[in-house]
Amino acid sequence: MQKEKRAIVVGASSGIGFEVAKLLIEQGWIVGVAARRVELLQGIGATAVERIDVTSDDATEALGLLIKKLGGMDIYFHASGIGKQNRDLTEGIELATVQTNGVGFTRMIGEAYRFFARQGYGHIAAITSIAGTKGLGPAPSYSATKAMQNIYLQALEQQAHSRGLNISFTDIRPGFVDTALLSGDFQYPMMLRPEKVAKDIVWAISHHKHIRVIDWKYRLLTAVWRRIPRWIWRNIKL
C-alpha cells in the first residue's frame, strides 16, 4: 500500500500559500497549515492547523507541534513573506522585511532541514522571487532578502549533498502575482493569477525541480536581467 504523503504549508492564510495548500489537499495529500492569522485557515480543509509567526522565537516549537499533529512531514513548503516598495527607505519597513524574509525564513527552513536530516529524507520548497535576481531600487530590503533566500537554499542543497542527506530543494521564483502583497495604486505589469501559480508550484515540487521561475515571460525577463552589466543597471529607472 502506498504511503500517505504529508505536507506542511507555512504562510497558508492567503495568496499563493492558500492556493497551494488547497491544491495539495485536492490531490490527496495529508496537509498541515500554519499562519499568524489562524482564523483564515479554518475553512481550507487541512488535517491540522497551527498558529505560527515566523518572526517569533517559539515558531520552531510550533512547527514541531504541527508535525506531531499531522503524524509526520514529507514536504515543508514555505510561503510566508512580506514586501513593500520603499523608495524613501523607511527604517521600519526595511527592518520588518529583513525580520520576516531573512530571520524568519532562516529559522523555519533551518528547522525543516534539521527535521529531515534526522528523519533521513524530505523535501523543502519555498517561494522566493525573481526580485532576488538583481538589486531593485524601489524595494531594497525585499530584493536583498530574496537574493539571500536564493543563496541560502542553494547552500543548504550543497551541504545536504555533501553530507549524503536525502533532502530535495525547490526554489520557487514567481514574477508579479495578483495577491494582497502587491495590492495598492501601482499597476504591476504581467500579473499572474495565484491559482495558476499554485498549479505550476505543485508541478515543480512533484517533479523535484531545483529552481522554477514562473512563468515563461519571467524566465525570459530574468535571463535578460542577468546579462545587464552593473554600470548599465544602475542607470535604469524602475
Per-segment meaning from a language model:
Residues 86-99:
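Short alpha-helical oligomerization interface
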Residues 13, 21:
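N-terminal Rossmann NAD(P)H-binding glycine-rich loop of SDR-like oxidoreductase domains
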Residues 129:
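Residue(s) in the substrate-gating loop at a strand-loop-helix junction
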Residues 45-58:
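Rossmann-fold cofactor-recognition segment
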Residues 77-85:
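Conserved NAD(P)H cofactor-binding loop of Rossmann-fold oxidoreductase domains
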Residues 171, 186-222:
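C-terminal helical subdomain
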Residues 109, 145:
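Active-site helix of classical SDR
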